[in-house]
Amino acid sequence: MHRIYTFLIFISQLALGLSNNPDIPIQYELANNIMENYQKGLIPKVRKGSPINVTLSLQLYQIIQVNEPQQYLLLNAWAVERWVDQMLGWDPSEFDNETEIMARHDDIWLPDTTLYNSLEMDDSASKKLTHVKLTTLGKNQGAMVELLYPTIYKISCLLNLKYFPFDTQTCRMTFGSWSFDNSLIDYFPRTFTNGPIGLANFLENDAWSVLGTKVNREEKKYTCCPVNYTLLHYDVVIQRKPLYYVLNLIAPTAVITFISIIGFFTSVNPFTNFCNVSSSVHDLRQEKITLGITTLLSMSIMIFMVSDKMPSTSTCVPLIALFYTLMITIISVGTLAASSVIFVQKLGSIGNPPASKTMKWTHRIAPFVLIQMPLVMKQAYAKRAKEEKHRKRMSRKNSMWTKVYHLARDHSKLMETVPDGAVKFNQISDFKNNDIGNMESPRMAESQTSETFAAPMDTSFTESLHIPELNRVASSNSIQSVLKPTEIQLTPYCTRNIVELEWDWVAAVLERVFLIFFTICFLFSAIGINLYGWYIWYTENHFLF
């Protein structure tokens, strides 16, 4: 028994000597003192009904990734949590006026601050916890604990891609205690001069810009628990920089579509000389179907590039998807329209001329679409009109010779039946002055000065009239040769090519109408959609905050 008592005295003296050893740092003595009766697994709460107030502050350092298909935001931030630990406190005068001390994070109690919408369940993968800073508030008053740590938050964010790539997204981070209600732990945000989330050390992102931040404190009651839980909602408003998509996707697609429209409905020298038609409708319009199919294939590649950026959602149609849909529709319908132009042109090879109503509407529309009738077609019309005029003139001549024939026949009968005497030849003289005088015969022109007269009916009557044609028509063979119709007709090859010219002109006018129509549709679709998206992007950028 005496030996045991001696050993205890020795141990106490040794401990006292170590405590008074001036070589031991004051932090060691302070740590041993405050941790002597500390239980890090229990909440450091002394007074009942008074929760531990945790102040949370965030500083955004970098936006790492915005993943549209998987709907999450990956960012790097610096977090600071502050609270008063009532079990950690000391009198600075007892420890050489030491007011601060650094301790390991796993030596003290930490609040279970949880990011509710985190996609990473392991805190060690998102937080880098090292040390905590303890600042005493006085003996039996506790100490202010500051936990500073860098973190990478992978948060779920419901992205609204309606105006993609001119979109603005708001991603929310919800913080709170997972185990303690607000009767034990209560949360409060700490704001900065430039907003609830600090941006002083933020690194600019090439694809996104931060428009602003917001914070909202909410006390929410769950059905499982009778007491409310405190939640802090941090909203980060980011806006996409659309330059990449405009230059690499939208602009090339618009250029390809516009060039395709021009290629569909623009002909090169569609008319050549008469009776030797070689329209580009024959040669070039056949390639327009291939052009349309090739353009659609190139569009499918670009759509594949865009689809990688899109989530599989049916809630809305992104603006860029609407843009590509309209471009594909324009090219598809344009290909069908080009086929209809080819069909109209091919009607000329059948040989049937266009209907008069078709030509009438073509003549009306042509000036509005700035299509003039080709010179070769005007020459063909002029030549056909000249031949028609010549045919009518020859028809009138044949009609006059028929009158001469009947007059000569009546004259012969008159000579046989009428006795000698004076006879008036008013009809003969009138016919000479009105009809025969218009005939293109020099010999007939000699008798145009005759007037109504009376002459004896003798054998010299025909000679006194100076109308040898009356003697010529006395022969039936001569009369039949005069009455034979004389028509000047075009060769079948030339006649067919006149029809082809007409159908080519109808096709050219229809082609120009399609060109104007599809150009207007392209301008409204391409420029209109992108201007609308840019307007939304600009207004949110300047008027959101």
UniProtKB/Swiss-Prot annotation:
Covalent S-S links between cysteines: C157-C171, C224-C225
Location of this chain's protein in the cell: Cell membrane
Topology in the lipid bilayer: Multi-pass membrane protein
Keywords, sorted A to Z: Cell membrane, Disulfide bond, Glycoprotein, Ion channel, Ion transport, Ligand-gated ion channel, Membrane, Receptor, Signal, Transmembrane, Transmembrane helix, Transport
Residues with attached carbohydrate: N53, N97, N228, N276
Signal peptide annotation: 1-19
Gene Ontology molecular function terms on file: excitatory extracellular ligand-gated monoatomic ion channel activity; transmembrane signaling receptor activity; transmitter-gated monoatomic ion channel activity involved in regulation of postsynaptic membrane potential
Chief localization: membrane
Disruption phenotype: Mutant worms are morphologically similar to the wild-type but exhibit mild swimming defects and are lethargic with their movement being interrupted by frequent pauses when crawling on a food-free environment. On the same environment, in other occasions they display decreased rates of spontaneous reversal and steering, and slightly increased average speed. Homozygotes are fully resistant to monepantel but heterozygotes are partially affected by the drug with reduced fertility and slightly impaired movement.
Pfam families with a match to the protein in the record: Neur_chan_LBD, Neur_chan_memb
Protein's UniProt keywords contain Nuclease: no
Membrane-side (Extracellular) residue stretches: 20-244
Listed InterPro entries: Neur_chan_lig-bd (IPR006202), Neur_chan_lig-bd_sf (IPR036734), Neur_channel (IPR006201), Neuro-gated_channel_TM_sf (IPR036719), Neuro_actylchol_rec (IPR038050), Neurotrans-gated_channel_TM (IPR006029), Neurotransmitter_ion_chnl_CS (IPR018000)
UniProt cross-references to SUPFAM superfamilies, sorted A to Z: Neurotransmitter-gated ion-channel transmembrane pore, Nicotinic receptor ligand binding domain-like
Protein's job: Betaine receptor that functions as a ligand-gated non-selective monovalent cation channel in mechanosensory neurons to maintain basal levels of locomotion. The channel is permeable to Na(+) and K(+) but not to Ba(2+) or Ca(2+) ions. Elicits current in response to betaine, very weak current in response to choline, virtually no current in response to acetylcholine and nicotine, and no current in response to glycine and GABA.
General remark: Suppresses snf-3 mutant phenotype growth defects. Elicits no current in response to the broad-spectrum antiparasitic medicine ivermectin. This channel is allosterically sensitive to monepantel, an anthelmintic of the amino-acetonitrile derivatives (AADs) class, leading to muscle paralysis upon treatment with monepantel.
Protein name: Betaine receptor acr-23
Record organism: Caenorhabditis elegans
Gene assigned in the entry: acr-23
